[in-house]
A protein has these predicted regions:
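Charge-dense, extended regions
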Residues: 151-235
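A structural motif corresponding to the C-terminal lobe/cap of the Radical SAM core domain
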Residues: 1-55
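Hydrophobic, aromatic-lined core segments that form the binding pocket/scaffold
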Residues: 73-179, 183
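An accessory alpha-helical subdomain
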Residues: 39-94
Length: 235
């Protein structure tokens, strides 16, 4: 069976009932939104570690959208991030509730499926908050922050000092000549992550293929006196 009016779509086949076609369409939509769009690269990498198979990511997301009445709605970019975070919150709660208190008997170390993925890499909601904020800012210097964003006010001093240092002696923002530190802080963005690092998003320098801003990660040196380049803990 198929729709007789545009858009022409298959509704069911000899082998697939209508319910399965709808389910596959939901999975297709999730792949398009969260993978093919290229707007969630860091978060997708983490999700691949959390789930046993990539297909489970999109199947679970499609089920979450359907269960919460989110399908068939034109969501904003920011809303897609909010939805993904709520999905992750729910998954986190389910994992915590299903974690057995006792250790598994000897000889039972080999695990398969989703449980293996959950125990292989201990990912927390903080890891995903960091990856989602990275994905948001690497695309654009957003003005409206999502509800799950961490409070940046405790790090105002560090951010201010970073841009003042760049104004005085540019090291990372060499294409911002003629702009003072306050202007630089508006044109670029420095985000404190929950893993203790800072990420600088440089919107004057973008990847020609993805359009993503150049991102440089920093942490304070052992003396705590200056920021030095750092590798991320998860992303």
């Amino acid at each position: 069976k198929y729709r007789g009016i545009p858009p022409y779509e298959v509704l069911s086949t000899k082998w697939l009932p209508y319910s399965d076609v709808i389910r596959l369409k939901g999975v297709e939509d999730m792949v398009e939104v969260y993978y093919n769009s290229g707007q969630f690269p860091a978060t997708m990498k983490l999700l691949e570690k959390k789930f046993a198979r990539p297909s489970e990511i999109f199947t679970s997301l499609a089920e979450y959208y359907e269960k919460n009445g989110l399908t068939g709605i034109s969501h904003s970019r920011l809303a897609r991030y909010e939805i993904l975070y709520r999905f992750l919150e729910e998954k986190e709660v389910k994992v915590e509730q299903s974690t057995p208190a006792a250790e598994e008997p000897a000889g039972m170390e080999q695990k398969t499926g989703a449980k293996a993925a959950e125990t292989a890499v201990k990912l927390t909601l903080a890891d995903f908050r960091d990856s989602l904020m990275y994905d948001l800012y690497v695309r654009e210097n957003i003005k409206s922050r999502p509800s799950f964003a961490s409070d940046q006010s405790p790090y105002k001093k560090e951010v201010r000092e970073f841009f003042m240092a760049e104004e005085e002696s540019p090291q990372w923002l060499t294409d911002y000549a003629g702009f003072d530190s306050k202007q630089m802080a508006k044109m670029a963005h420095l985000e404190h992550m929950e893993d203790g690092t800072f990420v600088l998003f440089d919107y004057k320098n973008r990847d020609p293929l993805s359009g993503n801003a150049r991102a440089v990660r920093f942490r304070y040196d052992q003396k705590g006196s200056r920021m030095v380049p750092a590798k991320p803990a998860r992303i």
